[in-house]
Amino acid sequence: MKILLIGEYSNVHWTLAEGLRQLGHEVTVVSNGDFWKAYPRDIDVSRPAGRLGGLQLLARIYTLLPRLRGYDVVQFINPIFFELKAERLFPIFRYLRRHNKHVVLGAFGMDWYWVDTCTHKKPLRYSDFNLGDQLRTDDCAILEQRDWLGTSKERLNKLMATDADVIVTGLYEYDVCYRPVFPSKTHFIPFPIKMPAVSNTGRCRASKVVVFIGISRGRSQYKGTDIMLRAAKDLQHQYAHRMKLVVAEGLPFSEYQQQMEDSDAILDQLYSYTPSMNPLLAMSKGIICIGGGEPENYEILNENELRPIINVQPSYESVYQELEQLILHPERIPELKRQSIEYVRRHHDYLKVARQYEGLYLSLQ
């Protein structure tokens, strides 16, 4: 098949492309590399800096459009698939829809269904937008609500979801937002991870537990990494002889990986039920995820044996307690590392995931 993957989130599309190519398909990835993370892509559509950046990008995309025709499948990472206002994306989507056979919409991150469901229906005990029945009031959550609810982004998302042949959800959280609305065409497929040639199940340092945390620019409070970082710093102060903390902020993907490499554990998103791409990549290397590991995460994967993730509730106290237990009981680390590697191999190996996508795409032909 000839497959076009548009947009990027945390290397999902590039990793999927690598798997699909291994299966013999012709794949083109068009993206901006997920901004400063600079993930690989075949065709770069980064927005130039400056006041005229939007117009320059729009001109480049219109020049590219004739090359983006005649594909068997076009998959969009998100309704905002280029760095343009939603109003500009309506005609581009319609063009790509008209000149290609089938359209797949990815439910992999921020969009109207995610914002609206978590704000109004609240099916999750906690999320980026709610803690129980209470709405979160931090600046990022409010900004996203204003950005998506009752706007052209909402209209674009609804159009693309309704018009798409299928919708693929990458995490449990997104599945519960789309499946009730589109039960017949929503398909859950786990995120793809390329397993490293060598994974480490031993301790990185015999004397100290090495804990890694990555900080996203401007999204620390929204993702809960501010709380996790505070707990980790307090524990480092208390257990300086037992723990080393590594903090990475705003790094390109290649540098992020290097800094993460020699860690025993990674602190990830506080308000998540599930591990996303960065913690899954860490787990594939034998790094323990401290973050989202709720029962629903294992249920959607039909995983009844492995429990590698140290699940935390969205509070300072929970993070502090769980991380402290790992520091005080480092004998747990080798088994959790082993389970982490097996978990990713079992559910997220990029070739296994690519075969699931291949089966879905073939069912559309």
Kindly give the residue locations of the regions a language model identified.
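Acceptor-binding helix/loop patch of EC 2.4 sugar-transfer enzymes
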Residues: 39-42, 46, 105-150, 218, ...
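Membrane-proximal helix-turn-helix segments that form the acceptor-binding/catalytic region
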Residues: 65-69, 92-98, 102, 128-166
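A short, active-site helix/loop in glycosyltransferases that binds the activated sugar's phosphate group
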Residues: 114-115, 145-186, 230, 357
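Conserved donor-binding/catalytic core segment of Leloir-type glycosyltransferases
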Residues: 185-223, 229
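Acidic donor-binding loop of glycosyltransferase active sites
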Residues: 261-274, 287
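Short hydrophobic beta-strand element within catalytic cores of glycosyltransferases
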Residues: 288-295
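A charged, aromatic-enriched C-terminal amphipathic alpha-helix characteristic of glycosyltransferases
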Residues: 331-362
